[in-house]
């Protein structure tokens, strides 16, 4: 369908050469915005518009667009099988080719939808099969008793202090293990106790760094040594 006259539109927008060529002295191909216009166009717009309109009217409508939309876009309610579709006998070769093309496209769409539905059915079946082993595995895991770690419940706090080093570890952790001093540490502590019965905090820090002991160990050793010294007196 043609919306409007092509020749009038072409004459309205393409007529520009006659007035401007006389006014400016050279060929001007722009748009003429003046009121008066000549009938002749610079580009032969009338002939081009007439030939275009004649070609548009002479060209027959393509069969693909002349067919109803339901034949190409949507399948019929009860489609025939692919082997039973045949072209119309009264149509020409071109029209018959287009018809067979449209029918084959409709058939392929139907077959494709059938194939997609079958694939969806297979997918749902496989998903159900996958869900079934997963649920069975979960049920088996719930039925089986979970094995408890064998070594964790048997470890108690009093068992962890059997292998504590006796030289450089001190401080209370519940019931503290007995500290065993080396001969060098005992000798140095006895020397210090011989000169000073009581230690200042600064001297206690120095002895602790020198003997690789803690301040609490030094303090307790001096307390015990003073109690023994008072008892022996």
Curated annotation (Swiss-Prot):
An example Pfam family from this entry, by short name, is Homeodomain
Q: Which UniProt keywords apply?
A: Developmental protein, DNA-binding, Homeobox, Nucleus, Transcription, Transcription regulation
Native organism is Rattus norvegicus
Q: What is this protein called?
A: Homeobox protein Hox-A5
**What are the start and end residues of every segment in region (Disordered)?**
1-101, 118-154
Give the quaternary structure.
Forms a DNA-binding heterodimer with transcription factor PBX1.
Instruction: Give disulfide pairs as residue numbers.
Output: none
The protein's matches in CDD domains, at most eight in alphabetical order, are given as: homeodomain (cd00086)
Q: Which GO terms describe its molecular function?
A: DNA binding; DNA-binding transcription activator activity, RNA polymerase II-specific; DNA-binding transcription factor activity; DNA-binding transcription factor activity, RNA polymerase II-specific; RNA polymerase II cis-regulatory region sequence-specific DNA binding; sequence-specific double-stranded DNA binding
Tell me one GO biological process term.
Answer: anterior/posterior pattern specification
């Amino acid at each position: 369908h043609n919306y409007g006259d092509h020749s009038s539109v072409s004459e309205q927008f393409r007529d520009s050469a006659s007035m401007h060529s006389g006014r400016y002295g050279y060929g001007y191909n722009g748009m003429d915005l003046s009121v008066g216009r000549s009938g002749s166009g610079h580009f032969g717009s009338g002939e081009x518009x007439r030939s275009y309109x004649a070609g548009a009217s002479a060209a027959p409508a393509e069969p693909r667009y002349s067919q109803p939309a339901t034949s190409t876009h949507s399948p019929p309610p009860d489609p025939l099988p692919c082997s039973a579709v045949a072209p119309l006998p009264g149509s020409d070769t071109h029209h018959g080719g287009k018809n067979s093309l449209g029918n084959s496209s409709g058939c392929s769409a139907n077959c494709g939808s059938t194939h997609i539905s079958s694939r969806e059915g297979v997918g749902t079946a496989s998903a159900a099969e996958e869900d079934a082993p997963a649920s069975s595995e979960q049920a088996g895991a719930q039925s089986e008793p979970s094995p408890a770690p064998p070594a964790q419940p048997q470890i108690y706090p009093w068992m962890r202090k059997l292998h504590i080093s006796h030289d450089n570890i001190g401080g209370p952790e519940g019931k503290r293990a007995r500290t065993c001093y080396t001969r060098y540490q005992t000798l140095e502590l006895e020397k210090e106790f011989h000169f000073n019965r009581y230690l200042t905090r600064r001297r206690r820090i120095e002895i602790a760094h020198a003997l690789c002991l803690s301040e609490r160990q030094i303090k307790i050793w001096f307390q015990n040594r003073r109690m023994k010294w008072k008892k022996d007196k």
